[in-house]
């Protein structure tokens, strides 16, 4: 039920996708600024990540006893009161049924009321923290570091901002039939079917947070990944297997680069090919021969070997051409190699 309310809050507030809803009321106090959380991908087919709280802060995994001097600023964000009637049919309804924990038999909708009141935002002074961590090192003997380092799927993150309530808040849910009066009155002892539910939680409860990933180097230095492009994790030692995979990756990259070069050189050829045969009903071969000045010849008959076409550049094995023109000269040669159709005609059309 608490998870359903925090998910709805994050969805409505937005913040560019950086905000993460607090999944459980019992763990809300563990998502404070400078706290550490573990980020894991749920599975290969599920794009979203799962954040797990830890009992540690950034200071706990650093060498030395010096406190982190980066301050935390806070300000009022908004006044949040939400009442919504959600259908049980559909994607959002399926998610809410799993979160609210009430009996929905015979119901087609759920009325949800969340009263958070004024919420405040507490965030770490990023510039101050970035200056400070340049002289700090990670303690690799810390249990959290050892366990995270052994897992390739886990990424350590530091909480950079949290959103909290300022007063006692209430959440209430009622399952019913759309069209009925969806009133919020809750008497648990007189509600044996469990179709209504309400909770009250104290002030200063964290309902959402955002994180920066940590990238940790082999020497203990670390970086804060302040943009979504940067990815956290641990720098890996270069082993024999790692070196082999690195070389294999470079070989595949070089091969793909060569393929892309061939494609880029042949793009002009392909564009004109489709243009000629799909946009123009008349063959350009007939047009070029009407000029009478440039004639397509077989270069093999003149002791000139086959080779790549001067226009499209495609000249490997079966794509090499034996045709060309003696009236054109390129690169000091008194002939050019051109594919019979359509390169020969495209070349001469562009020379006009």
Swiss-Prot record:
GO cellular component, one term: neuronal cell body
Superkingdom of the source species: Eukaryota
Keywords tagged on the record: Cell projection, Deafness, Disease variant, Hearing, Membrane, Non-syndromic deafness, Peroxisome
Compartments, record wording: Peroxisome membrane; Cell projection, Cilium
Entry-linked Pfam families: Gasdermin
GO process annotations (BP): detection of mechanical stimulus involved in sensory perception of sound; pexophagy; programmed cell death in response to reactive oxygen species; regulation of peroxisome organization; response to reactive oxygen species; sensory perception of sound; stereocilium maintenance
InterPro entries, sorted: Gasdermin_pore, GSDME
Predominant subcellular localization, coarse grouping: membrane
Miscellaneous comment in the UniProt entry for this protein: 'Pejvakin' means 'echo' in Persian.
Subunit details: Interacts with MAP1LC3B; interaction is direct. Interacts with IQGAP1. Interacts with ROCK2. Interacts with TRIOBP.
Function, in words: Peroxisome-associated protein required to protect auditory hair cells against noise-induced damage. Acts by regulating noise-induced peroxisome proliferation in auditory hair cells and neurons, and promoting autophagic degradation of damaged peroxisomes (pexophagy). Noise overexposure increases reactive oxygen species (ROS) levels, causing oxidative damage to auditory hair cells and resulting in hearing loss. PJVK acts as a ROS sensor that recruits the autophagy machinery to trigger pexophagy of peroxisomes damaged by oxidative stress.
Family, as annotated: Belongs to the gasdermin family.
Associated pathology: Deafness, autosomal recessive, 59: A form of sensorineural hearing impairment with absent or severely abnormal auditory brainstem response but normal otoacoustic emissions (auditory neuropathy or auditory dys-synchrony). Auditory neuropathies result from a lesion in the area including the inner hair cells, connections between the inner hair cells and the cochlear branch of the auditory nerve, the auditory nerve itself and auditory pathways of the brainstem.
Protein name per the record: Pejvakin
Taxonomic lineage of the native organism: Eukaryota, Metazoa, Chordata, Craniata, Vertebrata
């Amino acid at each position: 039920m608490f998870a359903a309310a925090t998910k709805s809050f994050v969805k409505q507030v937005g913040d560019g996708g950086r905000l993460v809803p607090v999944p459980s009321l019992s763990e809300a106090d563990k998502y404070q600024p400078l706290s550490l959380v573990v980020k894991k991908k749920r599975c290969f087919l599920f794009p979203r990540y799962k954040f797990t709280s830890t009992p540690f802060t950034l200071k706990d995994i650093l060498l030395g006893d010096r406190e982190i001097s980066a301050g935390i600023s806070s300000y009022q964000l908004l006044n949040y009161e939400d009442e919504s009637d959600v259908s049980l049919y559909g994607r959002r309804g399926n998610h809410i049924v799993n979160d609210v924990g009430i009996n929905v038999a015979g119901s087609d909708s759920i009325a949800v009321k969340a009263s958070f009141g004024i919420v405040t935002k507490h965030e770490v002074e990023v510039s101050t923290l970035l200056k400070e961590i340049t002289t700090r090192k990670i303690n690799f003997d810390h249990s959290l570091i050892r366990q995270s380092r052994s897992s390739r799927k886990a990424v350590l993150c530091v909480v950079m901002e949290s959103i909290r309530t300022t007063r006692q808040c209430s959440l209430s849910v009622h399952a019913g039939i759309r069209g009925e009066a969806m009133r919020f009155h809750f008497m648990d002892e007189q509600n044996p079917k469990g179709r209504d539910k309400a909770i009250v939680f104290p002030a200063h409860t964290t309902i959402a947070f955002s994180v920066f990933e940590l990238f940790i180097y082999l020497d203990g230095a670390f970086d804060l990944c302040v943009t979504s492009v940067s990815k956290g994790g641990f720098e890996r030692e270069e082993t024999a297997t790692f070196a082999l995979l690195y070389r294999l990756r470079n070989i595949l990259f070089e091969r793909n680069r060569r393929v892309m070069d061939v494609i880029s050189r042949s793009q002009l050829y392909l564009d004109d090919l489709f243009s000629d045969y799909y946009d123009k009903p008349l063959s350009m071969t007939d047009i070029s021969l009407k000029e009478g000045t440039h004639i397509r010849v077989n270069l093999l008959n003149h002791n000139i070997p086959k080779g790549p076409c001067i226009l499209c550049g495609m000249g490997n094995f079966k794509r090499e051409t034996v045709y060309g023109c003696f009236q054109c000269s390129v690169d000091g040669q008194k002939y050019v190699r051109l594919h019979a159709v359509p390169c020969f005609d495209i070349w001469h059309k562009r020379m006009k």
